[in-house]
A protein has these predicted regions:
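Non-catalytic interaction-recognition regions
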Residues: 1-90, 99, 104-564
Length: 564
């Protein structure tokens, strides 16, 4: 229906493209202002008239042609307000949303997107800060896949660097094989924290750490064996968390994968005369771009993560021939990626324009940024299990006879954490507030999941029923139903905008809006009635709503329990 209005406006406005008309067309917040509204401000220059006069003339022009899809078309100030013929509108919407792939797009067909996300630092616990990149990245993967893109999910593990030199020193001085095998990453974290405490008093420990990392880079057998052991232990924990979240990756190619590929970066920089020596190290100067220099090699000849990121980009372009490469990391890495992308540009690659940094805000509980070095860390697994346990307690209190309580608790608990992370713009900080996150009545994951379960319960109460292809659309013209149907039609556009802006929160907000509109419909419109026409039409509305909610939550990585 929106496309029909765009076509009608396009017929009557030669001075504006269809794309611009589509972008300008609005859904008014108040129903008494119509179903759609078109502002005429942008036409003032072309028409050389006041916007309200343009609106008046165009309204008269449209009414004169007598389009049967409108109940009426009026102008209010500089706006043209369209009131649709409700039965025709209801039919059009139901035909649109009642499709298996509603919301899916084709703009990504034949295109590849690489998304680099999660990427925890090996030998360190997976904390809630890592949850943000994992949750946002997974949602972007699903959103881009929905639009037809082929997506490569890359977990660029932080499995190389001087921190491993520190950890090897710490292990040799204060660790034991038995303790590490028994306690895993917790033990590695314990000795890593001790290293930093001791290094503040004895700087020679840092020198020893650098020496061990150089040994790693030179292929020292002992150093690499210890490093690989640390990595294997870490991956067991990380994969356990990904399984709990219901997520996976196509590649676990961390920084170490590129350690033998950094020479290509150095050679290309030398060929372009971009590599300069500075205090013994090698850098790319970015002064003229108002950026700090990009460090390529340290004094001791060891590589740095910028070098490995550059090597990774060259490898990914060659291997996947991506149309876009997205990095989902904290805001504190903004400069790092600006430098890396600028170096790619200076190397003469025009695909630097297809490199995107998607930053996000911090995570805290009762205030305070998370830190690894002093041991003041909130672990992801701890948070996830706590959410599951708290939901389990709520279910035991409110619905103790619920089947599959354990599985429902997992779905709702994990879903609550994911939804809380994705409900606001990613750049905003996330603060854990259990009462808010687990609220079944607020703008939360459990609320949307409960709405889905409510839809499912309608069909359980009705029993086995085969929904007809056509229904009596005249019974779907009340305000509650129309508002719900109009909201559902936004889904494809919301997905596109979420992809364009790298903002999954748009999907989360849409899901809440649909849930709210459905619950108003559920309250106002009795469904299981004797009149078969009314019953079937309203069941059809429940069915399409249920499918859209499930699809929207899936784009956020959230499952939908049938009962709650």
């Amino acid at each position: 229906m929106k496309n029909k209005i765009i076509d009608i406006l396009s017929e009557n406005i030669e001075q504006m493209s269809k794309e611009d008309i589509a972008a300008a067309l609005e859904i008014p917040k108040k129903t008494d202002m119509g179903d759609f509204a078109f502002p005429c401000f942008r036409l003032a220059k072309a028409f050389r008239k006041a916007p309200n006069m343009i609106a008046e003339e165009l309204t008269a022009q449209i009414n004169e042609k007598g389009y049967d899809i409108f109940d009426k078309v009026v102008n209010v100030g500089a706006y043209i307000n369209f009131f649709l013929a409700k039965e025709a509108f209801a039919k059009e919407i139901m035909k649109t949303v009642d499709t298996a792939d509603f919301g899916a797009g084709t703009e990504g067909e034949g295109k590849t997107v690489c998304i680099d996300y999660s990427s925890p630092n090996v030998a360190k616990n997976f904390h809630v800060g890592h949850l943000r990149t994992t949750i946002i990245g997974n949602s972007l993967y699903k959103i881009y896949s929905k639009l037809g893109y082929h997506v490569e999910r890359i977990n660029h593990l932080g499995d190389w660097g001087t921190q491993f030199g520190k950890l090897i020193v710490a292990y040799k001085k204060w660790g034991s094989k038995e303790a590490v095998e028994e306690n895993g990453i917790d033990e590695l974290m314990k000795i890593y924290v001790k290293f930093h405490q001791e290094a503040e008093k004895d700087d020679s420990l840092n020198d020893q750490a650098r020496e061990w990392f150089v040994k790693m880079e030179q292929g020292d057998e002992e150093a690499l064996a210890i490093w690989q052991w640390f990595k294997d232990i870490s991956l067991v924990e990380y994969k356990r968390i990904y399984k709990l979240l219901g997520m996976d990756f196509d590649h676990f190619t961390g920084e170490s994968f590129y350690r033998d590929k950094t020479h290509e970066v150095v050679e290309k920089l030398q060929e372009k005369d971009l590599l300069v020596e500075s205090e013994g190290a090698h850098i790319v100067s970015l002064d003229e771009y108002d950026m700090a220099p990009c460090l390529i090699m340290k004094k001791d000849g060891s590589s740095i993560y910028a070098t490995r990121d550059l090597a990774a980009l060259l490898y990914r372009k060659r291997t996947y021939n991506f149309d876009k490469c997205i990095y989902v990391t904290g805001l504190e890495q903004k400069l790092h990626f600006a430098q890396v992308f600028k170096v790619i540009e200076l190397l003469g690659y025009d695909w630097y324009q297809n490199l995107v940094h998607v930053p996000y805000g911090l995570v805290s509980m009762e205030g305070g940024k998370l830190s690894t070095r002093n041991g003041n860390v909130i672990y992801a697994e701890q948070i996830l299990h706590e959410a599951i346990e708290k939901i389990h307690e709520i279910i035991n209190e409110k619905n103790p006879d619920l089947p599959n309580k354990e599985e429902v608790s997992r779905q709702v608990g994990i879903g609550a954490i994911l939804f809380n992370d994705l409900y606001n713009q990613r750049i905003k900080d996330v603060i854990f507030n259990w009462d808010k996150i687990l609220n079944f009545d607020g703008e939360t994951g459990p609320y949307v999941q409960y709405t889905y379960a409510r839809c499912a319960s309608v069909f359980r109460k009705v029993g086995a029923v085969e929904l007809p292809a056509e229904v009596d659309y005249s019974v779907l013209t009340d305000d509650a139903t129309m508002n719900l149907l109009k909201d559902l039609t936004r889904f494809p556009q919301v997905i596109k905008e979420a992809a364009e802006k790298y903002e999954p929160f748009m999907i989360a907000r849409f899901a809440v809006s649909v849930a709210q509109h459905f619950n108003k419909f559920y309250h106002d419109c009795q469904i299981n009635v004797e009149d078969e026409n009314v019953k079937m039409a309203r069941l059809k509305v429940v069915d399409v709503t249920m499918r859209v909610i499930k699809s929207a939550l899936d784009l956020l990585g959230i499952e939908c329990p049938e009962q709650m």
